[in-house]
Design a protein with these regions (language model features):
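Short, surface-exposed amphipathic charged segments that create phosphate/polyanion-binding patches used
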Residues: 198-200, 273-284
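Short, flexible, glycine/charge-rich loop motifs used to bind or transfer phosphoryl groups or to couple energy/partner
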Residues: 60, 172-173, 190, 227-231
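Acidic/histidine-rich catalytic cores and adjacent linkers
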Residues: 10, 63, 67, 72, ...
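Gly-rich Lys/Arg/Thr-decorated short loops/hinges at beta-loop-alpha junctions or inter-strand turns
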Residues: 119-120, 203-209
Length: 449
């Protein structure tokens, strides 16, 4: 009895170890993403070698399946044939390149003598990139990495990254079945095309979702693009947020009859500061290069663009140009004393900016109409654009819409271009921008990869 109990205990312990090894093997296969029942690992299924001064892990296994009829002649006279070996790229193991050396079962038809292999769900047909590695490539493409960097991280080629990127469908607003209430329009310097150096971009002004990117910004291209949307959708657009571009005004008459223009508030301030800055440069160059006037007007130009209410009137700092202690307000007074025209222009833009900050449309337009006569003609002429866009400025003061989101997208595009060292193909740039912006992209079914 005691011997029999010992034998039973030994047998039970052996079975437990076998189960433990089997469970461990399954967990390792689960980490590798190789849990299919038809995948059978070899006895020594993991091998580590060095190729071209690089550590490579090789996972060895066999893919078995059954086949009852010939796909060519439908004959039932089918037998197994010698397996076909495939080297499949899978995600890195311990940060090193990993290959799956897979033997796929082949079959031969005795009637037509044709051979074929069974389908393997680990890899697309006629490809050596596994589905898991393709998904990992897309995760990297979602981040702002260059294609060559992704290829280096995953031990693949740049063209492989490009092919995988193009095999993913992008759900965009190009279905032409929806337009938002607020439409933001702008242009950016992207890829030089036949239409020009500038590309067009538009997005939803409320949820900041990218709508589309066009290779050109001409009026004919914009009208032909937006006319693809139904009239019902085009009538839903109530506001067009844009800079002071005259060509965009014609879009309202031709495409969006119910929309009104909203001038972006940033461009209003930018136009004011730019005009004053150009006048400052003209006046500065009237003085000699080594004079205190030119040096100080050139050095402290930011103080002249600063709001007078934000100037420090208490803290004294030594100024080596004037050899005395001055506050910011006193320094600005010194600069304005160099030229009377500069002083009048400064007072004018300060009144204009105060009206802008208070969103007082009437006071803003009164300042434009009553611009001082002693100011140069070129300076006054540049403010005539506010009269042409007075309705858009009114909407900018009364509504809260702006092009802040689209300007941020333009900055993101600059970063994408800089990381990629520029783009030569417009479609590749457009696709990458939409992937990084998360424009409703979803991968297609595994079998279509």
């Amino acid at each position: 009895m005691q011997k029999r109990e010992i034998q039973v205990m030994i047998k039970s312990t052996k079975t437990k170890n076998q189960r433990r090894i089997s469970l461990m093997d399954y967990c390792i296969r689960k980490l590798l993403g190789l849990t299919e029942e038809n995948f059978i690992t070899d006895e020594n299924w993991l091998e580590t070698v060095t190729e071209n001064h690089e550590i490579v892990h090789k996972v060895k296994g066999t893919w078995t399946n059954t086949c009852t009829s010939c796909p060519y002649c439908s004959s039932k006279n089918v037998i197994k044939h010698s397996p076909m070996e495939h080297k499949i790229r899978i995600p890195h193991l311990y940060g090193n390149k990993t290959l799956l050396e897979l033997k796929v079962q082949r079959f031969i038809c005795k009637d037509c003598r044709k051979t074929w292999v069974t389908d393997c769900p680990l890899v697309p047909k006629n490809s050596n990139i596994s589905y898991d590695l393709a998904c990992q490539i897309m995760l990297y493409l979602k981040e702002n990495f260059s294609r060559k960097t992704i290829a280096k991280l995953l031990s693949i080629s740049d063209k492989t990254v490009e092919r995988v990127m193009k095999k993913f469908k992008i759900k965009t607003m190009q279905r032409y079945n929806y337009l938002p209430k607020v439409l933001c329009l702008d242009e950016f310097r992207g890829v030089k095309t036949q239409q020009g150096k500038m590309n067009f971009i538009c997005l939803d002004g409320e949820n900041h979702q990218l709508i589309d990117i066009l290779p050109g910004r001409t009026l004919h291209e914009l009208i032909s693009f937006f006319m693809k949307f139904s009239r019902k959708q085009r009538l839903k657009v109530k506001y067009l947020v844009m800079d002071m571009n005259a060509s965009y005004q014609n879009l309202i008459k031709a495409v969006f009859p119910n929309a009104v223009i909203v001038v972006d508030r940033f461009h209003i301030v930018q136009h004011i500061n730019r005009n004053f800055n150009q006048l400052r440069v003209v006046i500065m160059k009237q003085f000699s290069a080594k004079s205190t006037q030119q040096k100080t007007l050139k050095r402290y130009w930011k103080l002249l663009l600063k709001s007078s209410d934000e100037l420090d009137e208490e803290k004294l700092r030594y100024n080596y140009h004037f050899k005395t202690y001055l506050t910011q307000a006193q320094l600005v007074d010194k600069l304005l004393s160099f030229n009377e025209v500069l002083s009048d222009a400064y007072d004018f833009i300060q009144e204009l900016r105060k009206a802008y900050e208070k969103k007082d449309y009437e006071a803003f337009m009164i300042c434009i109409k009553e611009i001082p006569k002693q100011l140069p003609y070129e300076f006054k002429k540049k403010f005539e654009v506010f009269k042409r866009f007075k309705n858009g400025i009114y909407q900018a003061f009364t509504t809260g819409y702006s092009n802040g989101a689209i300007e941020g997208t333009n900055n993101l595009i600059k970063v994408i271009k800089r990381v990629a060292y520029g783009y030569r193909n417009f479609e590749n740039m457009k696709l990458r921008i939409k992937i990084i912006k998360g424009c409703f992209f979803t991968p297609v079914n595994r079998k279509s990869l």
